[in-house]
């Protein structure tokens, strides 16, 4: 995965008051931490961050921080981001410094591709999980993992251990949750339920 640069600056002052002041100025408070590195309080420019999030790698981009401070040149990933529930804009960002030669755990989006045989027969595809935890070197972090559902019939389920992964990418061995399932014909079930209700109403009327 290609790396991208992000210009940041050292944040002067801590606490909620400082963070609120930065947001009023249109900036995003952030922090960088990681094994063997000095924790740094930072300030991020929203447009630069938005460009990274909107890239192909998205939230799993490898980012090289640039600026004057101990953080300069550190390679990080976006570990956490607090978002305004109404405006959907970032309120605070956590960057985790990583070692490019050590495997890391990341959450990657799952993308369903294809139309299942069960859907063609009138079934309903239910997506149970939208992301998966992966273990890999930072350079091998994928933007997403595709889940091919074309072979699934009604009653079938696909588990995370069944998902095809890129080379150099692993799923923790103790994890095997259900990703998608194909259930029966919901339309028929609803129709049958309506018929039962109608029959019950007719029986009630006959008994009056």
UniProtKB/Swiss-Prot annotation:
Subunit structure: Part of the 50S ribosomal subunit; part of the 5S rRNA/L5/L18/L25 subcomplex. Contacts the 5S rRNA. Binds to the 5S rRNA independently of L5 and L18.
Molecular-function GO term, any one: structural constituent of ribosome
Cellular component aspect of the GO annotation: cytosolic large ribosomal subunit
Pfam family, one: Ribosomal_L25p
Protein family per UniProt: Belongs to the bacterial ribosomal protein bL25 family. CTC subfamily.
Stored InterPro entries: Rbsml_bL25/Gln-tRNA_synth_N, Ribosomal_bL25/Gln-tRNA_synth, Ribosomal_bL25_b-dom, Ribosomal_bL25_C, Ribosomal_bL25_long, Ribosomal_L25_dom, Ribosomal_uL5_bac-type
UniProt xrefs under CDD domains: Ribosomal_L25_TL5_CTC
Organism placement in taxonomy: Bacteria, Pseudomonadati, Thermodesulfobacteriota, Desulfuromonadia, Desulfuromonadales
UniProt record, GO biological process: translation
Name used for this protein in its record: Large ribosomal subunit protein bL25
PANTHER family (UniProt xref): RIBOSOMAL PROTEIN L25/GLN-TRNA SYNTHETASE, ANTI-CODON-BINDING DOMAIN-CONTAINING PROTEIN, RIBOSOMAL PROTEIN L25_GLN-TRNA SYNTHETASE, ANTI-CODON-BINDING DOMAIN-CONTAINING PROTEIN
Keywords: Ribonucleoprotein, Ribosomal protein, RNA-binding, rRNA-binding
Entry function: This is one of the proteins that binds to the 5S RNA in the ribosome where it forms part of the central protuberance.
């Amino acid at each position: 995965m290609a790396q991208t640069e992000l210009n940041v600056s050292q944040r002067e002052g801590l606490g909620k008051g400082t963070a609120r002041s930065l947001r009023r100025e249109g900036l995003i408070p952030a922090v960088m931490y990681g094994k063997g590195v000095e924790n740094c309080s930072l300030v991020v420019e929203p447009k630069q961050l938005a460009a990274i999030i909107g890239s192909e790698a998205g939230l799993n981009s490898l980012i090289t921080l640039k600026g004057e401070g101990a953080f300069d040149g550190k390679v990080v990933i976006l570990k956490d981001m607090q978002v305004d529930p109404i405006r959907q804009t970032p309120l605070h960002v956590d960057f985790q410094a990583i070692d490019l030669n050590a495997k890391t755990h990341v959450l990657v989006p799952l993308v369903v591709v294809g139309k299942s045989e069960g859907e063609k027969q009138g079934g309903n595809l239910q997506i149970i999980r939208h992301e998966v935890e992966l273990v890999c070197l930072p350079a091998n972090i994928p933007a997403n993992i595709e889940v091919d559902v074309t072979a699934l019939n009604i009653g079938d389920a696909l588990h995370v251990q069944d998902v095809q992964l890129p080379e150099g990418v692993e799923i923790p061995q103790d994890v095997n949750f259900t990703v998608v399932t194909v259930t029966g014909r919901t339309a028929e079930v609803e129709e049958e339920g309506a018929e039962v209700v109608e029959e019950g109403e007719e029986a009630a009327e006959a008994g009056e």
